[in-house]
Amino acid sequence: MILFENVSKAYKVHRHMKPVFNNLNFRIDRGDAIGICGANGAGKSTLMRMLAGVEPQTGGRIIRTMSTSWPIGFTSAFQMGLTGADNARFIARIYDRDEDEVLAQVEDFAELGDYLYQPVRTYSTGMQARLAFGVSLTVDFECYLVDEVTGAGDVRFRSKSENALMERRERAALVMISHDPGTLQQYCTKGAVLYGGALTFFDSISEACEVHYGLQTLAR
């Protein structure tokens, strides 16, 4: 379970606090597959970092009783001066996994070749996403957070990523951000719309996408 109780978030901008969220109240349980819709700048990535526990809230309370991945695609989790392999080994130590086993899994899945042994700062955005996705799959989380990662790589790699994500969705919670409604509808059953600092949930991902695009149309 991940529970948000009256959670707010604000950033200090030029001596003033700029609110991002106000009084968010929701719960995510194991087995949920939730797609989050929102315009650029609405705070989707901030929300994902808060779900992961890497971004503190300004007010309210967040309770976590299940293990949660870092946001897949959130490459700031890596040490850019280290190689991809060293980052994988570091993650293995954090989660008490066998380092050689984790490295072998990442090498096989991410398909980075010799680049796996080069500093992450030399990677393209797509290569960083491959590494993030590959490393995340070496840990059995109870909730996976996905931020626009499945578009990385060629058709074959995307297909492999999709299959891996679908397999984990069967036994864990999934929270996904994507600008593509087709992707959200492929993976998610429920939806939420982030708009004006509020997060509104819908029983259907299709309904959430429809409301989101309706709001976007009105804003134009």
Question: Where would I find each of the regions flagged by the language model?
Answer:
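Conserved beta-strand-loop-alpha-helix hinge in the C-terminal portion
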Residues: 198-220
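ABC-family P-loop ATPase nucleotide-binding domains
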Residues: 10, 14, 67, 72-159, ...
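Conserved structural motif at the start of ABC-family nucleotide-binding domains
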Residues: 2, 19-23
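Conserved catalytic Walker-motif region of ABC-type ATPase nucleotide-binding domains
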Residues: 4-7
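Conserved H-loop
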Residues: 180-187
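Conserved A-loop
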Residues: 9, 23-28, 62
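Conserved catalytic loops of ABC-family nucleotide-binding domains
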Residues: 164-176
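ABC ATPase nucleotide-binding domain signature region
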Residues: 30-35, 39-93
